[in-house]
Amino acid sequence: MSEIHSSNAHFVEKYKDVLYFSSFFVPLTSNLWQLHIMRTKGEYIEMLRKHMSVLKQQFGIRSMCIFGSVARDEQGSDSDVDVCVEMEPDIYVLVALKQFLEKLFGCSVDVVRRHRNMNKLLEEQIERDALYVF
């Protein structure tokens, strides 16, 4: 837990359950994506579905999809995974989610929270590419 955000005691105290669970559940090194194994979109979706109860209960995610190069089968060995979620607007939970997914996948992850005022071009791209996990 201390490696995640040791300088911010408020963050750690407020989200200790999520951070502890994340660290315990997927105990991998923080820079594991250097050893990134390229996966298919189906493999990423399967991994997320296996962790669906964790994602819903620990992070409060109502829906989740993958978009971008992975969803279009255009990813390369250095690609990140783009994930869009519907959840309450909480930056600390969003950061913890990003860290959880990066440890789970072993690569860089970009997390976008869907909301009413989001950039329309981004929203259109997400809808065009979206592969819904739940």
PLM features per residue range, with description:
Residues 1-2, 131:
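Accessible peptide chain termini
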Residues 2-11:
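Extreme N-terminal basic, low-complexity initiation segments
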Residues 10-63, 71-77, 87-134:
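Catalytic core of pol beta-like nucleotidyltransferases
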Residues 65, 82-84:
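Short, well-ordered beta-strand segments
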